[in-house]
Amino acid sequence: MAIRDWPEDARPREKLLKQGAAALTDAELVAVFLRTGVAGKSAVDLGRDLIERFGGLGALCRADRVAACRAPGVGEAKYALLQAVMEMARRTLAEDMQAGDALSSPAAVRDYLRLILRDKEYEVFCCVFLNAQNRVIAVEELFRGTLTQTSVYPREIVKRALAHNAAAMILAHNHPSGVNEPSQADRSLTRRLAEALALVDIRVLDHFIIAGASALSFAEAGHL
């Protein structure tokens, strides 16, 4: 049965408008995004199939172009729309992070870093530069590496921090392996960076390791 023939309260779009997006199941959310189904399947059925195909809603949203466009009911236009939605989410989180104090709203910083780093297939080292009020000046990806490591040069980080006239920084890198435990090299690097930046009166407030959906804080774990 086509969705248009369902009772009004059961139709995903009408349900969203009346009860809010949080009231929808994952399959119903995907159905609203898709708008239409395929032969023999409603948009909700198709949404359910796509979630199962990719292993979850998050995995569907993060699927690459080739994999997404091979899936029934998606195609280039839907993939482009999905990428636009994801980029809107990233920019919204960036605005939230930049609007607040990084110390009083650490969740916004953590969520943003998790969003930009979690799906990288190689190690990336990022720096969040903060002013004297702990507000975000800039976020920069400074180094890229391989699946298991990246080379980080303290001198370059100090140069960028001085260029931004930063008073403090938050460091972040990802572990594509999915293991968020800091290695001895991670701890040693954090210590060296904190010492190098302290020489120019710049504080390192935290260092996050992003591993899949998890984010480990050096400050919270007592490593900083």
UniProtKB/Swiss-Prot annotation:
Pfam families associated with the record: RadC, UPF0758_N
| Motif segment (JAMM motif) | 173-186
* Start and end residues of each MPN domain: 102-224
SUPFAM superfamilies, per the entry = RuvA domain 2-like
A Gene Ontology annotation in the biological process aspect, one of them, is: proteolysis
- The UniProt record gives the binding positions of Zn(2+) as 173, 175, 186
MF GO annotations = metal ion binding; metallopeptidase activity
Keyword list, A-Z:
Hydrolase, Metal-binding, Metalloprotease, Protease, Zinc
PANTHER family associated with the record: DNA REPAIR PROTEIN RADC, UPF0758 PROTEIN YEES-RELATED
Q: Which family does it belong to?
A: Belongs to the UPF0758 family.
Would you tell me the protein name for this molecule?
UPF0758 protein Tbd_2588
